[in-house]
Amino acid sequence: MIPLLSAEQLRQADANTMAHEPIASIDLMERAATACANKLMETLACDVPVAVLVGMGNNGGDGVAMARILNMAGQPVRIIVPRYKPQGSPDFEANLGRARKDRIPVDFLEEGAELPAFTRGTLVIDALFGTGLQRPVTGWLKELVMALNQRPDPVLSIDLPSGLFVEVNAANDPEAIVQADRTFTLELPKLALLLAENARYAGEWEVVPIGLDREFIASLKTDAVVLEAADVAALMPVRNRYAHKGDFGHAWLLAGGEGKMGAALLAAKACLRSGAGLLTVHVPAGQDGVVHATLPEAMVSLDEDGTALAGLPKFEKVSAIGVGPGIGKADGTARMLKLLIQQAPAPLVIDADAINILAENKTWLAFLPEGTILTPHPKEFDRLAGKAANDHDRLMKAKELAVRLKAVV
């Protein structure tokens, strides 16, 4: 699992690495810049001009150091510094001095100045602001960001697109955030990069390791983590070479209705693909033919109703039950769902129309067995938990709902 740190925790991780490695802050900056420059040069043609737009803090220092490294590799590079305060951070100023000694062109923009024109095909590296930003970009700097976003030049952001906050962006100004084509985020993913509404800012992003103290990072308490394939693989039991289908559980799927058997088939295929040894699909009477023809490995149970599910099957040797895809919201189907969650003989996975039924009958949520899995898409979730103002708000509502229901959402 990869922890998703807050801005303050990211600062602590930097400070801890510097104190305990030990390494000076300017040397850690050099390490980060080298890692980003090397990653960029894996795909960047040697004749592509690069313009590095830097702020006067440590994210800007990363950008200046990166410009120096690219220059040493023979890349045509220039540095652009919007001078929004008299003095930059010590590490920024030190790197700027080194860049001048290397005779890298440096353009200072005084307040009110426009973004200079770039040679056609220039790659712009955005190193204005990093994870320490705590308020929206305003005034002249916002105008520069807006001008950059209107340019056709490709943009690579370092750590985060300038203007984007690490976690919550509800109070941010969407016009004051750089819209990058690509983002190199340092050491760890950031929560903001994982929210769909921020995709237009980050573009394609990837993590660039810079050697922070992972033991310290693992000791921090975080509200969110990213699951990796290895985390899931560790939960999968090793299959005995002499095992057979009866050793891997019997799943039941209550799905489908008149005109919606495709949903049942897709869910059934996914269930078998996930590793269930046996699968019985409960469908309306007369709808079994398509299941037999498409999934001969699945067994079929027939409901008494011919258009929608209206009753519970006689469950036999059931390990888990999925319900919802394509079932509709008829009164009889709703009654069936209520009985199921009240009498469930096995763990439940609730999806699609079953979630929509619960959204219209929220008092039934009290009947959900502990450990139930709910799999709504955003619209279904909003019906169930209330309309979310943004993706982060939806994430917080999902957390609250999961805790309240003792469920997985």
Q: What positions do the PLM features span?
A:
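N-terminal small/polar loop signature for handling phosphorylated ligands or for N-terminal nucleophile
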Residues: 65-149, 289-301, 309-317
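Internal gly/pro-rich beta-alpha loop/helix module
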Residues: 121-123, 128-222
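Generic hydrophobic, helix-prone segments enriched in Leu/Val/Ile
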Residues: 105, 165, 392-394
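Amphipathic alpha-helical segments in well-structured domains
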Residues: 96, 141-145, 180, 337, ...
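Short, solvent-exposed loop/turn segments at secondary-structure boundaries
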Residues: 91, 136-137, 169-170, 385-389
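Small-residue (G/A/S/T)-rich helix-start motifs and N-terminal tracts that mark the onset
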Residues: 1-82, 89, 182, 188, ...
